[in-house]
Amino acid sequence: MTDAAHSSQTGPVTELTKALIARPSVTPLDEGCQTLMAERLAAIGFNIEAMVFEDTTNMWARRGNTGPVFCFAGHTDVVPTGDLSRWHTPPFEPTIIDGYLYGRGAADMKGSLAAMVVATERFVAKHPNHPGSIAFLITSDEEGPFINGTTRVIDTLEARNEKITWALVGEPSSTLKLGDVVKNGRRGSLTANLTVKGVQGHVAYPHLADNPIHKAAPFLAELSQTHWDNGNAFFPPTSMQIANINGGTGASNVIPGALEVMFNFRYSTEVTAEILIERVETLLTAHELDYDIRWTFNGLPFLTGEGPLLDATRHAIRQVTGYDTDPQTTGGTSDGRFIAPTGAKVLELGPVNATIHKVNECVKVDDLEQLALCYEVILEQLLC
């Protein structure tokens, strides 16, 4: 059954999600998504502050002038569509089929954004004089290089000592059904770009060259087998994965002059980036390699333990869905890593993530409406 057949039956969250999906906001574009949200929020008393940094559109919206500050955080940008011929429906023409809303960004994360807005509208209507503040931190640079997005907004807020108490990020945390998993932390991320130097030459005259691939092979073997830590009750053991490796000219008769290797750590709170860097560079020295290495720090690990935010989220999911959630720290990074270092408690709660970044991305229509109910209950638990 098509969208047209369902249009009269869809709820307010689904309708707003459709309006957002229809804006082709491939990162770092926003395409008016934040304006649409801002209009709805301004109508219920939010002060809207646009923060544009180079090609990135950000929005800081706040209702209230006192603490505590509850912040909804998310992004309006989406990943590219991929092969259009593999989509059942056009990715920027939101379509409902058999109870699922299809479109790029349906699950990641325009559905969450719509649920946040609708939940806030309902909450403010019931509690116009609520204590504390409600805020929205929205960016169009989460799926891209994450240079001019949330991190720049946080820098601005920190410079004027404007603090967030609790942040709820709308990333699609659920796995099999809505709310079965929330993310109450994330591992740190550290990337290395390593160049091992050699001497280029003819393969028939190896004594006149120095093969960096041969030299680096024992190091790479040891690196891949190194045990970094045991993890802990909240985080799995630190993982290192080689992501890219390149050497040679493409010719079969040339010994390469350099080998380039990119590898990434996803690390627990049992180690620090500094410890990992020291151990890798000690290993490089032990293998007597001539090398250059560039480190890129992508985010600290963070953890939101027992407390008001986790309690409120557990209560909301149980009340709306009838089952308990499972807090986890697995998966990739999110913009929560930029908010947590300020001292804010951060959680991620959003739709099922089975189709994110794929062709035919979709979200269950009923889940969108239930997600807004979860968000509303969380607001009531924390600000009433």
Swiss-Prot record:
Gene Ontology terms: cellular component: cytosol
Active site, renumbered: D77, E142 (proton acceptor)
Chain positions recorded as Zn(2+) 1 binding sites: H75, D108, E171
Reaction it catalyzes: N-succinyl-(2S,6S)-2,6-diaminopimelate + H2O = (2S,6S)-2,6-diaminopimelate + succinate
Pfam family name, one: M20_dimer
Cofactor(s) annotated in UniProt: Zn(2+); Co(2+)
Name of the top EC class for this enzyme: hydrolase
Annotated residues for binding of Zn(2+) 2: D108, E143, H357
Alphabetical list of InterPro entries matching this protein: ArgE/DapE_CS, Bact_exopeptidase_dim_dom, DapE_proteobac, Peptidase_M20, Peptidase_M20_dimer, Peptidase_M20A
GO biological process annotation, one example: diaminopimelate biosynthetic process
Function: Catalyzes the hydrolysis of N-succinyl-L,L-diaminopimelic acid (SDAP), forming succinate and LL-2,6-diaminopimelate (DAP), an intermediate involved in the bacterial biosynthesis of lysine and meso-diaminopimelic acid, an essential component of bacterial cell walls.
Subunit structure: Homodimer.
Protein name listed in UniProt: Succinyl-diaminopimelate desuccinylase
Gene: dapE
